[in-house]
């Protein structure tokens, strides 16, 4: 089972990692944040990647090319793991930054979960 690189288990592991962060957080993600709170490059790049999800789905449906979704989920996984390593969520500098990062983690989890399910793959909460 290869949890590194461009594999299905890598995407599943990334989903499980996001679930773990959300479980360890003392509060649930908030629905509203100040977008200006996210300042790091890894945060910005992950937000931009997540914004592409509706367009990726439209492309998959219009072109009948499911590999577009698999490539996208791998990119999201790479960006999430960069964010995870560069942007502490639990133990962030202040509560506003922690809340913003926690919401970004939850949004990433949603995209990975939905993408995996669309491909007929499990989205495990633990690995």
What are these model-predicted stretches?
Residues 1-127:
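Non-catalytic interaction-recognition regions
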């Amino acid at each position: 089972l290869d949890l590194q690189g461009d594999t299905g288990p890598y995407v599943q592991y990334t989903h499980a990692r996001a679930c773990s962060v959300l479980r360890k957080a003392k509060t649930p993600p908030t629905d509203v944040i100040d977008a200006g709170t996210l300042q790091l490059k890894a945060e910005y790049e992950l937000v931009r990647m997540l914004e592409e999800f509706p367009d990726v789905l439209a492309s998959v449906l219009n072109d009948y090319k499911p590999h577009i979704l698999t490539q996208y989920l791998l990119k999201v996984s790479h960006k999430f793991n960069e964010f995870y390593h560069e942007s502490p969520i639990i133990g962030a500098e202040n509560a506003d930054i922690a809340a913003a990062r926690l919401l970004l983690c939850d949004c990433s989890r949603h995209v990975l979960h939905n993408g995996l399910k669309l491909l007929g793959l499990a989205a495990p909460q633990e690995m």
